[in-house]
């Protein structure tokens, strides 16, 4: 499973390339995720992403990441080109382009590089003689495609990833190709209050791969735009996995975020409802973002 997809709560572009430039803002984000904190050599993932609109109907996006899990590491990235078709003449956010109703398409080229850390051979010199470690790295390209539609408060997206069934030659053998996977999500933003400075956003996401392994996320977010200088949001999320081999079959994830000027700060905590609960302190994620223009609510 691509670890970065689990960070979509802070940036929907991570699961759907059509989100590149879909919102009236340019967004830069850096995040750090620590899984199963408290256990030795717990996994850790760092991510840097950017998305913006460069012309009236064209958006671009990119991210790079690094993941460490024990002696193995993975690095990679993605570059995206998206096209947005306005479907209304509203002027809610911009004097030039309408973002109220919009249909977007996006395609990405992505790549991953796998390698074994040298620390393995320091801790276990005999590993140098193991033929399984004759080839300790591998490069794997792939592609994604996505569609995104928004109509005022409603939004829905469909994306397909790992479109090319390529396998990396690593650990002395061919690895299985990354599974062809689809994401379907949808939600609605309800404006609340006389000034409509508060909002409630229910959202659901369904993920399924070619092996019929299914994840379903149910999310409920509440936000308050106190003024143009700052705001906050809180969210409760629940994930259920229809895959008996997934040790995170059920996951609870509360999270919160703040907007201070053009800066955005977010924190998420995940707790898997399984036997590992008593052996670790859950998964922690911190996000810092910056928007280059004012965007009502949180930039998807």
Describe each PLM feature range:
Residues 1-300:
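Subset of outer-membrane beta-barrel
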